[in-house]
Every structure is written in structure tokens, then in C-alpha cells.
């Protein structure tokens, strides 16, 4: 703190401000005195008549410095020449008034006072040190009882509490043999008496001999605290203050308002209270007042100091005149409005402005339109200097007048100033780094900022009244960074997934799609052209329609690896309009790429291919040209929307009637009692969701084609030119789901609680809704809107937590040299390969050689997999690759470039200094908000899917079984009796094309290695029940299945057959709660096999019946799921990142071995695993849990025993960190994929790395750790390397998984943790330990106001460190090279303006 105050003294010696770390400790009384410039003796603030500060008061000029610059209070000394003189009359030093911001005062307290943070912030530090309970300490502090501080030779004990009665008794008995006190004095004495080293030794001896867990916990906590005090040179008695620092007056100002009133900071009230009580107490002590009065006054002093430090922490908060609690010192720094988040992490910026945005379709990608008025204001100082240097004005004042009058020459100067001076545009909320980009301003009339349409996706902007802010980078370095790193032309790829984000959308897509579509019998069909230009001329002269099919000779330029070009001319069949696109495509791209229908996906592919093959500059020019072309053609096409375009399919009526009939049938079955209410509901919902799909399909089929007359006069079918279809098919606007509601049927709607209303809306929007239908509609839609509001906040909070946990992760080295990595496989869901292996490993570094089936090395370890590598992997049918990952990177602080791989936003290997942590957090958090804002588009229409009950092959191929355990059924098919069975279908090369999870109890209709045709059924099962299957043949015998107590007889009305249904323990009479209903099978081999039956099982066999292998003994009904909505989504992502243990989570086998069941205790089953060495693991599992494994089965460690959501902590413990990483990555990806959002796995891995930072010590070995400590993984690794080098026992530890909030609070940096959450707790803990913040992360550096150690700041810090170590700091040139790794920014070499480049580009005709 001393240094912090010193840096404030004189800004002149700025060089001294460089520091490498900040320490926080308790302040000793001497320290507080040394900060102080005098004692505040009076509670007065300023004189009400003269408005001058009162002497010795809270604003005293003698203590804190002069009120006006270089002027003492009485006015004897004025002006600068007297600087440093102390006036003899009023005692004020003549200096700048700014010193009133950093000169502190102090108050000498008449009686010591405990610091409330160390008392009440849990765990209470004072309580821990004294080993007393908080209640007891409070009773002493607030003068309710005495505490014995020195028992002398009496029978009393130290730390014993005595109330008044006991105290007087003891006095009578022992006289002054003992000392007992009350109040903070007593606590201070006790703290002074603690001999820290002695206590530590005692505890170290006591800990190994402690049996009880709670005692052990308490002792190790106390030991940690004592060691913290010992190591930090803090004295325990400093937690009780005898001298109170006073904040500089300008930080708690008193401002005169009009009307003679004053506005004051609450702190002044709180200080006044303290001073009043302190002075009263001094007087009472001088008068030797009665004990009880003094005691009361001391208690009041303690309370007022408590309120000053942290109001409301104890008792009722002190309130001001307006009944609201006063803001204490602690409130000043915590929370969103506190010092950290309001002023240190979020500053307001000068040279900025904001205005509404409008579209600027004529701009180039690197430009934005800036209103003249705004530009003039923003660039004022620059304009002044230009006016002066050009001799148009002689003084600044004159220049100012000219600018105010807006004289004509001012505009010329402004244009000169603005040329090549980029500005930053920002749209709130800035959810990822593309929300702030640099543009070159173009001066425009009007008052709105013009924005280039292609960057709207990145800003998530639209033109319905959005506003944007403009900032001016002032220094040359800032301009350089803006131009080379932040220019919109350098941000073509999205950092989240590496795909182009500068991709045409909406109108542009519509225009491009329209001209690339072929129409039958269009004008000029069948013409053949010699050159592309000839065809373009024909289009221009209206002899050729853009939709006509033609043939044309096309000359392509092909570049090889070295960049040499060859030309190749071919005759191509194409559509006339596609030549317009070919005309703007850069040289070196293939004609085939634009010879397709230009849907949004294809345009994105085209842009991607252009970026990868032709580089940034070409891509930018191409994107602009595409946009101009798209806008023009969309206008010319005349595509618009009309009510006639919503064609209702003729089949709709029949389909709905058929569905109604089905529903009636089910209603009848329900009335006759064949189906339960739940089943009826499920089936009805099922029917309607199927019908809805059928109607939608009929509608789309109907919309998708037109019958037209071709040139021969015959009818021909062609893809439709219906406006709505065009918009949806091209991806310009609208989705099949929305068209379905316009022209199909609206379908099932959800209630606000997520359940589906079983009566669907049969009408669509074109037919119009009845009142009831409208009501049902709004019912679900309103939920969508309410959700949105809530979820936006949630998503923002998720992003904040993610940024906080990942902020200090930066690329610090090139290669850590680790051998480790993670195994990547294709991502499979519902049998389909959703994400090919190639796509998942693109941009990663290979960790182990990738081998072909012939054992050749295809990709050696250490190669970065690029697009070419992906082709190699796909062509060779490789189904797993080991790649380097951030999770296994060995760099202690940060990560290495090899483990991270490709920088997604730039498309080459990541640079050192890239802050990958923040990028990851933004990439995950940004779509969260997008998703929350997009729920209501489909209007609450329930997107429920019909339940699967069988699988059939999609492709022809060969069957492969995975983890299959089957029993042959009498009917000749196989019955699956394993839990995680999967069936794959491989092609001739051996590549798996599809893979399906098959549930327990399915009938499999094929054998391993069989060849199957596309569409052939492979397996089937009943989705609504879970069967219990016997693997053996034998005779079934009932055990504990008693009618009326554990089971009840259900009679099927149709067949008259009766079957038992097992009752849950809740529904049983009390005497049969502990019975365990089971079927015992006496097998033909003479063994007994027991099948326990869970509640609600419907038994399918009778007592004494002979059963065959594969038969079903009973079925357990399963409920079907509700709707899938991102509501499940966002909270799901948050749960995964917070590593929450799910409710009723899956139970996993703790070790491999054989299963048996012990005697059950009340409500729980005893589950036992015995491994090969005879070790036994027992656990109690609640009876209602359905255990998947039966007696005598073998299980592997980590296998699921009882179904449920997996618990990430179990996965980490039983299967290791890579299994955990795969689980979290897949789960998070599933949520985002459901919403069609693409995020690269790397980002999720980065967050997981941060969640795995801590380990728990299980055996301390020869280190200074304790068992149960939580330590940084990097530190333990370093410690172990040291220990092993010295041949000592290493530390044994277990990796810990921390949720992101916990991980943020557990960071090494207390500044970062304090600015995140729970500020008081973090600072209290840090101060006691005397923690040093090394300022490694980004956040800490922002708070202390330095350049961040990432990006260009990394070079600065490296240079600083070198200079500090006495090495020559390197020159500016090389520093800049390091900062902007030159290969990274292709446009850095191109400092000519884009316009020149552009003109040159167009002049070279294709």
C-alpha cells in the first residue's frame, strides 16, 4: 500500500511506477500512522458560512492539503512561487489541490476496536486463531461477558467466559490473582499472547493422532491460518485496530447543491459518528465515569467502526435520513457498482460518440459512413492542428472559432485528417471480439452512421433502430493495431468455428440464388457462347435471360503449389446468371465452385474456398463484389411475398381426417380401459406430431415443384420459382418450420410449463386461426417472450463466468514437447455421423503418427492437420486420430501453440500471445445469448419428435457389433443383454458410415459381419418399457411377490388375462416395506439366478412357468420426454461448466469385479463388487434406483450400474481427464448443435483445462503440503519434479474438477478473484495470507492499468522483463515484429489504400 501511495505523490518520476506484483497485507498501527498527515480530532466538515474546511475536522486543509491550487487557506500565500511553503498562520502547505485525493489522516481510538472483516467474514479469522466460537467472541467484543486473559494460579482457565455474576464471584474468591477483561482490548491481549511457532508445532504433533474427521478438518484449517500468519509477517493483534485511517477527502466529497444544501458521501456520516463517539469516550475516560457508561460508549464505538468498514454485516445497517442504509467502505469496492467493476474494469472512453446505424450498400468492406458533424467533434484536436499547420488559423482559439462556425476550409482539413485514420465501431452487447471492429471513415451527410451490410452478422446488428458507438484510436500505435489487427477486412473468419463470418445473407443470397437457378424454356435457352464476355453481353442486351440453360467456353486459371499459373479452357453447361458470379470470382478459383445453385450454404463454401486458396485480399474484394451483384439482382428479380404464394397442400384435409380417426380410436380404447391415461396422451401427441410432419412434407413437395411447358411444348417438372420457396430454399429468410405454420398446419403447442397440449392447431396462418386456436397459440408464445428476457440475463452471466475463469490463458510458448493428447473419433448421434473425424481434427496437431491400414505413416506426429490432411484422413477411412490438446499441455502458466493448433480466426498456426482463454469464453458465451433470443421465432410450436422403436440401415454395407452381449431367442433372432451395445455399418473400405446405440432387450435381426441393404431393418424394441430378460432357460419361481402387499393384480379387460404389477415401497402396507420382490430362476444347469423386480414392473410370466433364454420376465414402463428447447439448453451448459452433480445421477462401478448384493438396510440395497485380488467395495444404493446389473455379472471400472445423468466428478475419478473432456465436449456440443450453432471443440477444452487446474493432495510425501489441501496442478508438478530429483517421496494427488465460479474464485490472483464475486471474502483471505499477486492474467493488469500480457502487450512485458534483468531491451523494430508476427497479417504489408488495390484488381480483366 505504501508504494501505491508513493506513486500518487509525484507524477513526475513516472519511471518508478513500474512494478511486477502487488501484495496485500494487514496494516500495522505504525504503518497507518506513517500514511497519515495528521489526526482528525473533530467531526466538523466545513464552515456553513465561509464554506471553508474546519480545522482538525474531516476536511481540514492542514491535514489533507489546500482546497485551491497553490493557495493556503487564509490566503497569505498565493501562486506557484510559494510551492512547498507551510503557512504559519493556518498551517497549510502550498501545493496542488490534487493532494487531497491521496493524503490520508487518522483517528486515534480511545479503545481498540476489532476489524469486522476478520471477525465476521466466514470463516472468522479471529475465531480460528483463538479457537473460540464466533458467538463467544462477539459476547466479549460487545461487552456482554468477561474473558479470562491470564488465569494466574487460579482454577480458572484461559479463554474462559465469565458473565458479571461469575466475574464478581471470582474476584471475591481470588482477588487480583487473575486478569479478565471485556471488549476488543481483551481480544487484542489474547491475540498478542499467541505464540505462533509453538502453536504450529503442537498442531503438527496433534494432527496425525486425531481420529475424528471434524476435528481434523478444524485443526488443519487452524494450522493453515497460523502458517499464513507466520509466513506473511502479519501479527494477529493487527486484526484489532487501535488507530483508524481516514480516507482522503476528495474521495468522499462534499458538494454544494443549489439552494444552499449539500450532497455528501455516506462515508462522511459514518466517520462523523466514529469521531463523535471516540471523543465522548475520551472525555468519559478522563472524568473516570462509571464502568457501565464507559462500557456502553466503547460498544457504540465498536459498532460505529463496524458500520464504517462494512455496514450491515452485523446487526441492522445504519441508515441515513432517507431510511436507506449508508454505503460503507466495503460497499464502495464490491458489486457491479463497486470500484472494481465500475471504474477499474469498465471505464468510460473519451473521443467517442454514438448514433443510429443505417445500411451502406455502396460502401466497401473496410469502410463505414461517419456523419460529418460527428467526425468534426471526434477529430477536433486533429483538425485544430491541421488548421494551424496549414496557416489557416494563427492560434488555437481562432481555430476553435473556425470549427464552431463550420467554415468551408474546416471540412477540407477534416477530410485530410480522416484519410487513413481508422475508427472503431462497437455495438452493445459486445459478446465476442467481432463486436468491435475498425473501419476507415467516409464522411457523409445526415446524422446516422452507415454500416457495411456484410459485417452485420459479426455485430449481430440490424437496421431497426440499433445504435452503435464510434471510438477514435489516438496514438500511432493504436492506429497501427486498429489497421492491422482489427480492420473488418482482417476479420473474415469467425473465431468460434473458423468459418467465414463475412458471408452474404438475406437479400444478397436471394439475388445470387435467383440468378444461379435454371428455368425451363427461358429466353436464349440452348445458346452456345465462345467466351464468357459474349454471354454477359447477351444478358446485358436482354437477348439472354439469366435463368436460361446455355453452353459456354470457360477459361480457368489454375495455380499449383508454387504459385505458377496454367490456363485451361473447357466447354461448360451452365446457367447464364452463374456467369455473372464467375465474372467477379478471383483468378485461380474453379468454375465448378460457382456452377451450382447459390444457396447460403454454397455461398459460404465459396467464400471459405476463396479465403483458403486465394488469401485475404482477394476474398475481401470478392465479398464486396458478390454483395453488389446480389443486391442488384435481387432488385431485378422482383421476388416478393404474396398471400397466394402460401399454397396449402390439397392432401391436408385427408391427412387431418385420418389423424382424427386414429385419435378417436385411441379415445375408445382408453374408455374401455385398454390404455392408461398417460399412454393415451403419449399416443395422441405422437399421432399429431407425425401428421404435422406429413402435412409439412406434402406442403413442401407441393411448393417445391412447378409444372411448365418446355421448348418442345411438353409438360415438364422443374424446381419451383414460388417466392416463399425461393426465400427458404436459398437460406435467405424463413425456415421449413415457419412455412409449415404459414401453409401447413401450426401443429402442437406447448404450455408455459413445457408440456404439450394434446389438441393441435389444425389451421395455418393463411386460413386464419379461430379464437380458441389463437388463445392456445398465445399461451405458448408468451412463454417464449418471457423466457427470452430471463435467458438473456442468464447467458450474459454465463459469459462473464467463462471469461473470468479463462482470462489468464494465453499462448506463452511454441511447443511444450508433451507426448500426450486426446483421442478423436467422429461424432455420432442417432446412428448418423453428425461430424466427420476430418472436421473435428482440422487445425489440430497430430500427437501420434496416423497410420494407414497398410501401416504406412500418413501424418507424422507434430504435423498441423490442414485441409489437405483432412482429405488424407477421410480418404483412408481412418476412424480415430490422437491429437494434441490444451487439456494435456504441459506449460505451467498458459498453453503452447502446438497443443492449441490453428488460430481459427486467422487460419494459420496460433501466434504466441494470442489470448485463447477469452476467445474461448466469448465463442461459447456469444451463441448462448443468440440462442436465448431466438426461441420465439417458431412461436412456441412444440418441436417434439416421435419416439424411435427400431433402426434400419441407411447405407448398404457390413454389420459390425460393438460391446454386444446377446442371447439366442427361440424365434431365431438375438436378444441384447448388454448395456452399451452399438451396431455399426461399414463400407467396403472399412469406414463406418453409421453407428447406432441399441437399448437393452432389443431384438437384433442380423448377425455380426452380415451384409445389409439400404433400408433393411436391423433391430427393434419397445420404446415405452424397459424389459427384464433372462439369459438362461429354466423354471421361474416367485419370491416375495405377494398380492395386496408387494404386488397387485391387474386384469387386462380385452384378454381377461391377469398380471402382477409390483408396488413401490410407498404404496405398500408397513409390514411389507422391506420385502424384495424377485423372480428366482432354477436353471436347467441347476443354478439359481435371482432377478430383483423394481417398482411398477409388470410381470410377464407366472409362478412355476418354464422359460427359455431371451424371454421377457417383466417390463418396467418408461415415461416419455417433454419438448427439447434451449431452455434445457442454456441451464444445461451452465450445469456442465459449473460441474454440478446431477440429481439422481448415474451410479458407476468404483472398480472392476463381480457384482453381488448384500443384506439390504432400510430403503437401501447393499451393492458389492469383488475384484480378482479379493478386494471388496461396498456401497448403499437407494431401493428405488433401478440397478442395471444382476447378481454375478462382471462389471468394469467406470461402467454404469444404475441409469441416470452422468456425474462429471465420477467420470474424472474413474475414467480420467480425457474421458471427462470428451464427455463435457460432447454434451456441450449437443446443446449447441440442436440450435444449429457451430463451435470448435478447442474452445470447450480450454475451459475444461481451467476447471482442472486444482488437485487434492491424497498423500503429502516429502513436501510441505497437507493431506486434503487444494493446490494448483502446475505447482504440484513442479514440486514433484524437485522431489524426484532429490530421491524423495513425491506427492500423491487426485485431479479436482471445479465449476467455473469456484475455479474463478480459486485463482492465484486475488485481484482477479476479488473483482469477480465475493469481494470481501477474497480480500480478507488474501490479506491474512499476505498474498502476492504476480499480475499474470489479463484482468489483474487491466485493474492496475497496465498493458495486458497478451497480443502486442506480451512483447512489451517481455522487453520490460529483459530491461529489468539488465539485458538490453530490444529496439522498437524487433519489438514490433514480435508483436505483429508479420506473416499473420497479410494486409500489414499492403499499406496502400484499398481503393488503389481494388482499381488495379478490376483493371486486369478476366
From Swiss-Prot:
DNA-dependent RNA polymerase catalyzes the transcription of DNA into RNA using the four ribonucleoside triphosphates as substrates. It comes from Psychrobacter sp. (strain PRwf-1). One of its GO terms (biological process) is DNA-templated transcription. Belongs to the RNA polymerase beta' chain family. Binds 1 Mg(2+) ion per subunit. Binds 2 Zn(2+) ions per subunit. This is DNA-directed RNA polymerase subunit beta'. SMART domains: RPOLA_N. Mg(2+) binds at residues 462, 464, 466. Its cofactor is Mg(2+); Zn(2+). The lineage of its organism: Bacteria, Pseudomonadati, Pseudomonadota, Gammaproteobacteria, Moraxellales. GO terms for cellular component: DNA-directed RNA polymerase complex.
